[in-house]
């Protein structure tokens, strides 16, 4: 089977329902927690580490759910949602490779926020660079990531870790 190298929103929502890669595969979260509208490129090689990369985008609109509650009178996208998007994309990479299991964020080394996403922004862009993939009894990916708003880097994270687990009862 030939792998796709880009995904639209409908395909990403199909992943949330278990329809894109099958019921046993990892799933993206559904709306409103799916934090990107499309994956513009995904490769199992490339990136600075040569281990793979994912590029994705989120269209910013003033009516996005988080602007109405974070904060009243001072709307800003919560930084943790951008970080979660980076974990979502790292886990999606493992699922796209064909690894089975449910995705779980396992941590990260360093996170920096140097800007914010406001309702008048137009586009958030994510760059995920895979630095390590383990596909044995433990299935895990490690990545370095950046988030841009309107082409300005505002978040960075190093050593993001996501695992896929076939059994999560004792996790």
From Swiss-Prot:
Pfam families: FabA
InterPro entries associated with the record: FabA, FabA_FabZ, HotDog_dom_sf
Active site per the UniProt annotation: 70
Translocase keyword on record: no
GO molecular function annotation: (3R)-hydroxyacyl-[acyl-carrier-protein] dehydratase activity; trans-2-decenoyl-acyl-carrier-protein isomerase activity
EC number per UniProt: 4.2.1.59, 5.3.3.14
Localization, UniProt: Cytoplasm
Gene3D superfamilies: Hotdog Thioesterase (3.10.129.10)
Catalysed reactions, as listed in the record: a (3R)-hydroxyacyl-[ACP] = a (2E)-enoyl-[ACP] + H2O; (3R)-hydroxydecanoyl-[ACP] = (2E)-decenoyl-[ACP] + H2O; (2E)-decenoyl-[ACP] = (3Z)-decenoyl-[ACP]
Gene Ontology CC entries for this record: cytoplasm
Pathway: Lipid metabolism; fatty acid biosynthesis
BP GO terms, sorted: unsaturated fatty acid biosynthetic process
Keyword Lipid biosynthesis: yes
Subunit text: Homodimer.
Family: Belongs to the thioester dehydratase family. FabA subfamily.
Function comment: Necessary for the introduction of cis unsaturation into fatty acids. Catalyzes the dehydration of (3R)-3-hydroxydecanoyl-ACP to E-(2)-decenoyl-ACP and then its isomerization to Z-(3)-decenoyl-ACP. Can catalyze the dehydratase reaction for beta-hydroxyacyl-ACPs with saturated chain lengths up to 16:0, being most active on intermediate chain length.
Record-given protein name: 3-hydroxydecanoyl-[acyl-carrier-protein] dehydratase
Organism expressing this protein natively: Stenotrophomonas maltophilia (strain R551-3)
Lineage: Bacteria, Pseudomonadati, Pseudomonadota, Gammaproteobacteria, Lysobacterales
């Amino acid at each position: 089977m030939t792998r796709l190298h880009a995904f639209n929103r409908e395909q990403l929502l199909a992943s949330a329902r278990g329809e894109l890669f099958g019921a046993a595969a990892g799933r993206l979260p559904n709306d409103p927690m799916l934090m990107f509208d499309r994956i513009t490129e995904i490769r199992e090689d490339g990136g600075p580490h040569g281990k793979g990369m994912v590029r994705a985008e989120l269209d910013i609109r003033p009516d996005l759910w988080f602007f109405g509650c974070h904060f009243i009178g001072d709307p800003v996208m919560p930084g943790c949602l951008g970080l979660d998007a980076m974990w979502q994309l790292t886990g999606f990479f493992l699922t796209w490779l064909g690894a089975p299991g449910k995705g779980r964020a396992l941590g990260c080394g360093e996170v920096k926020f140097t800007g914010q996403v406001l309702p008048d922004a137009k586009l958030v862009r994510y760059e995920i660079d895979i630095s390590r993939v383990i596909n044995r009894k433990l299935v895990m990916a490690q990545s370095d990531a950046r988030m841009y708003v309107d082409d300005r880097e505002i978040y960075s994270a190093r050593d993001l870790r996501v695992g896929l687990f076939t059994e999560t009862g004792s996790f």
